[in-house]
């Protein structure tokens, strides 16, 4: 088990991996559907969602279906029906799951481990409990000061014992002072 603060760096600035993945997908969908000129001046996530749901039409619905069919978990949900807004939320979650898995794999390559896959070659890694932790405002950051955390659970295979020992004792990623990056390891079986 691992609670981590996954971040991505763009143009020298660190961004929350989850929020970045969602924003990237929404921007891509708006661009693919040629709706960029319809965006309001304040381009928050809710504005993208509203625009896509109101003006995306059948092309948007079809694109969400394509995104969801790639992931077995969400393809199963797709068979249950649901509203277009549900499909958008599932597509965002599928995108986040994929992004977090890539982040975790990248950490493992650097730190001597990899997630174990099942018989269908799907990772046994699960993520849950995404949270935003607000910190008291210092330095003029206002209410945006804080960090996010995600809990990972799954099976690992150690690929480099020395690197893994270092990760086990030092931790993974950022926000270790806030309890992130600490591995809880148990023997399988």
Feature map (PLM): residue ranges:
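RNA-interacting cores
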Residues: 1-189
